[in-house]
Amino acid sequence: MRIWIDADACPKAAKELVCKFALKRKLEVWMVAGQPQVKPPFACVRLVVVESGMDAADDYLVEQAEPGDLAICSDVPLADRLIKKQVAALDPRGREFDARNMGDKLAMRNLMADLRDQGQMGGGQAPYAERDRQAFANALDRLLTRLQREADLRASQPHR
């Protein structure tokens, strides 16, 4: 299992938490970005800066991630593409994307984009706060535990 991060939009505090969890669990972290980033100084972390272009980082992430991997992203359409590929997805505020909630999340994202385009709504999300970091840490721990159990179960079953 690998952890993928949509690095352009991920808060630094969330990236740091992912690295701590990855070190503890001996997992690889792949940070994918469309812009240069500072790579955390850990051997388990890889940084890929893709050529610029609309959705180039998203496309790379979707192409490279495999079923059973985890992606950290706040981009709802990207999460939808990953979920369809059986890659788990979690946003940096601790909210998990899954097949059950994806339709609602896409509809809400589209509604909010329309309201912003019409000038009826301002800005984006609130600043990343300590409660967001804590919610993310808790959700990340739960999700990694679940994914590891599922991977162990798959590995223990005889191949046909």
From Swiss-Prot:
InterPro entries to which the protein is assigned, alphabetical: UPF0178
Alphabetized Pfam families for the sequence: DUF188
Family designation: Belongs to the UPF0178 family.
PANTHER family: UPF0178 PROTEIN YAII
Protein name: UPF0178 protein PA14_69280
Species in which this protein is naturally found: Pseudomonas aeruginosa (strain UCBPP-PA14)
Lineage, highest ranks first: Bacteria, Pseudomonadati, Pseudomonadota, Gammaproteobacteria, Pseudomonadales
